[in-house]
């Protein structure tokens, strides 16, 4: 899986960076959002807790997808602005299991 970032815009109103990217995945299924998020965190040198992948739209008939991610300044900004559904789909199964145990 390769990620090619083609737009990185600063949004000062929401204290975040807005990232648009292409994901290329030759010979495999469309990657999970959590896998894409992990790779983006490494590429952008951001914190995993303050990064969300908003959506990934596969191209029909091609091993390629268009994605949109947001990197917030703080976790508090992310929790205040993002919907629970976006936060939930960016949470890994192991993190959810830990929260259920508490």
Curated annotation (Swiss-Prot):
Q: Spell out the molecular function terms from Gene Ontology.
A: structural constituent of ribosome
**Annotated SUPFAM superfamilies:** Ribosomal proteins S24e, L23 and L15e
- Kindly state which keywords UniProt assigns to this record, in alphabetical order: Ribonucleoprotein, Ribosomal protein
Annotated Gene Ontology cellular components are: ribonucleoprotein complex; ribosome
* Listed GO biological process terms: translation
Does the keyword field hold Ribosomal protein? Answer: yes
Question: Pfam families per the record?
Answer: Ribosomal_S24e
Record family assignment: Belongs to the eukaryotic ribosomal protein eS24 family.
The molecule here is called Small ribosomal subunit protein eS24
Organism equals Methanobrevibacter smithii (strain ATCC 35061 / DSM 861 / OCM 144 / PS)
């Amino acid at each position: 899986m390769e990620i090619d970032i083609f737009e990185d815009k600063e949004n000062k109103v929401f204290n975040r960076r807005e990232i648009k990217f292409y994901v290329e995945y030759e010979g495999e299924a469309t990657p999970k959002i959590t896998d894409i998020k992990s790779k983006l965190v490494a590429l952008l040198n951001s914190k995993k807790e303050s990064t969300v992948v908003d959506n990934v739209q596969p191209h029909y008939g091609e091993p390629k997808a268009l994605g949109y991610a947001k990197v917030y300044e703080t976790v508090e900004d992310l929790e205040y602005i993002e919907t629970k559904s976006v936060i939930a789909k960016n949470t890994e199964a192991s993190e959810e299991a830990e929260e259920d145990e508490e």
